[in-house]
Amino acid sequence: MSIDATAGGAGRTIRDPTNGEEITFLETAAESGEDRLVIRLTLAPGGAVPLHAHPAQEDFECLEGQLAFHLAGQAIELSPGSTVTALPGIVHGFRNVSGAPATLRIVATHGAEMEYGLRVKVAMMQDGAFTSAGRPKDLLLGSVLLHRSAIYLAPMPVWLYRPLIAGLAALGRWRGREQVLRTRYPDYVRLLDAVHRRERGT
């Protein structure tokens, strides 16, 4: 994973060359007290974030370029100054449809889980663990991460996806995949800590 280091030692900008995605952390979870995350996301021409849903709310503002945004089955065109909100659990995704880079400013709740989940996902993409479409090559390894992150990938029906991912994640943990994540990706341990803190209400 390509990282630009900050004075504090954490990567302020992470890049995924497989899909032309660049994420700059404008306000990290640590800086917000874990309540929120603010990022700037830049997509290369044709770059896309596939349809998905998660427990966090995201507020999007288009800063440059043109994007085709899909929200709960509706198609929305975003241009500079346009905004859209994806509420928790609502399926959304977007694609850069311009011939130049497109940039979004995104404010998300569940800051710690969102940040560390993004960091692990991009690191795994760099390692070749995911396809450019965001699908895990090792189903058990990917399922453990998706389950811990509470990420839903469309278009599989939610009623089928959730028990399937839970079952695959349980099998993955039994087969040692979670230990692989813990060993290779320090941010995965931070993700687990954030999930446990939320579950305890602390």
Predicted feature locations:
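Short amphipathic
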Residues: 38-42
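Jelly-roll (double-stranded beta-helix
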Residues: 1-19, 26-36, 48-51, 55, ...
